[in-house]
Structure formats: C-alpha cells, structure tokens
A protein has these predicted regions:
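C-terminal non-catalytic regions of proteins with extracellular/luminal or membrane-system context
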Residues: 1-278
Length: 278
C-alpha cells in the first residue's frame, strides 16, 4: 500500500471517532480514568491476548496500519503498562500468531498486583470468530485478576453483545470498545487516560444472558431489536441508549406533558462535575 500524506489526517479522524464511540457501561469508585501524569503515570497490568491482536473491523478490508491496545497504552505518557507482563504477551504472540491466550500458570497475580496500581482485562472477538459467551479460560482469568487487584477495568473489543457472568460484572469499570478501527489502541488510551470523556451510547439492549435473545427469523417488524425487550420483557443489564461518562450532572424540575399524540419532556440539567463537565 502506497503511503500518502492524507493518511495521517484520516488516522486522526478515525481516532477521534473511535474514542467518542466508546461506551462506558460501568464505572464505580473512580476506577476510570487512570488519571496519572507524565511524571507519575498510572501503572497498569494488562491481561488478555486481545491487547496484541486487537480486532479492528469487518473482514474484507485492510487498513494501512493497526494500533493494538497495548501499543496505544504504551504510547500514552500518563499510563505505564507493566513492562514484564507486556514482554510476556508480545513473546507469546510471536510464537502463537493464531491468537491463543497466554497460560495463567506462567503469571504471578500477586506479584503483578504489588507492582501496579490497576489492572485491565481485554476480551476480544473478531467479526470472523464472534462468540458472545466467555470461555472458561476468560472467566478464570477475570476471577484471578479481580481477586488480586482492587482496581480493574474490563475492555470488550467485539462486534457486539458479550454475555457478562457475575465475575465480569465485579470489575470496577466496563468499557465496550467494539470494533474501533485502525486507531483502536490510541482511542482506548485517550479514554482510559481521561483525555477524552466517553460519550458513546448503546445501539442495542444488553441482556443478562445470551438466551434472552429470541432465536427467530430476523425480520424488521415492530418488535425488532431493543423493542423486543421493551415488549416481551427479560432481564436487561444495560438498556438501549445507555452509556456513562466521567462527568456528573443533576436533574431537577422534570415534567412530562401529553397533548394528543405529542409528548413533551422538560428538565433542568446542572453540571456538578469539575474536571469532566457533562
């Protein structure tokens, strides 16, 4: 592929779009952002082979470069991925290009927890190998990481819904990165470092279990997508349109009016966050 000057401009657009599309599903006890400085970066132990083999998009297209999650975090001066753990994953990836996971037996969770402030777990699925259910290995990895670290962020780099068992929901923060394109690693680094406030919203309802999806012919009728759950019920973890941010706001004077078929909703919204205004 021939390089052109416009590629850098396109990369900046791709990076901004990917960062703005990140959906923050959960964030408790200020797990995110990893608000470090250049002099005192936040030390993060990153787990999951998806940090190396980060899926970028659908098959049939090949971007001129791919920035994986580990590379993106490494380039961010306020975040410092654990060097030893990163070396283990890079070496394993060279020997196992098929994308198999690094065995947990070769890792000392307690040792990494003592040397780092936080942990990040990457769950990755490409469009060609999309399975919404976590493997037993992934569940075990989450249990061991959350058992050793008190501050854990879970990143989902997948085409869509992933079933989140209880151990996954125990993570302090959950980010749906999706298939974020060639700048995925840089975009995620912008979000977790606090340079960009996540503003993405879910375009679908996120149920508790995969079985909640009705296995029927996909027809664009009145009950398609999120309307199915609105009509027929089911346990929903995150509803259609859901997405958190780092800022805080207070709502008051909420009123709803109905005039024939016209519904009017009004409210007063006040920014209460200092660092990240809504």
């Amino acid at each position: 592929m021939e390089y052109t000057a416009r590629m850098n401009e396109h990369a900046l657009v791709s990076r901004a779009a990917a960062a703005g599309s990140c959906v923050l599903l959960k964030n408790v006890e200020n797990t995110l952002p990893f608000a470090g400085t250049k002099d005192e970066p936040v030390r993060v132990a990153v787990f999951g082979i998806g940090q190396i083999f980060t899926p970028t998009g659908l098959t049939g297209m090949e971007p001129w470069r791919k920035i994986g999650i580990l590379d993106g975090l490494t380039a961010e001066p306020t975040v410092k991925p654990d060097a030893l753990l990163a070396h283990k994953y890079r070496a394993w990836a060279l020997e196992h290009p098929e994308g198999s996971e690094l065995p947990l037996g070769s890792l000392s969770m307690e040792e990494f927890a003592s040397m780092n402030d936080s942990a990040m777990i990457v769950l990755a699925r490409s469009a060609a190998h999309y399975d919404p259910k976590l493997t037993s290995f992934e569940q075990d990895m989450i249990r061991k990481v959350t058992g050793a670290f008190s501050r854990v962020a879970l990143v989902i780099a997948a085409p869509g819904y992933m079933e989140l068992p209880p151990e996954a929901r125990n993570c302090g923060a959950i980010i749906f990165l999706g298939l974020a394109g060639q700048e995925a690693g840089y975009a995620l680094a912008d979000v977790v470092s606090g340079k960009v406030c996540p503003s993405g919203k879910l375009s679908f309802s996120w149920p508790e279990t995969l079985e909640s999806f009705g296995l029927t012919a996909q027809q664009l009728d009145g009950f398609f997508g999120y309307r199915y759950f609105d009509t027929f019920g089911g346990e929903i973890l995150f509803p259609f349109g859901y997405g958190l941010g780092y800022g805080k706001a207070e709502f008051s004077s909420v009123s709803v009016g109905l005039d024939g078929c016209e519904v009017t909703v009004s409210a007063t919204v006040e920014n209460t966050g200092e660092t990240y205004p809504v």
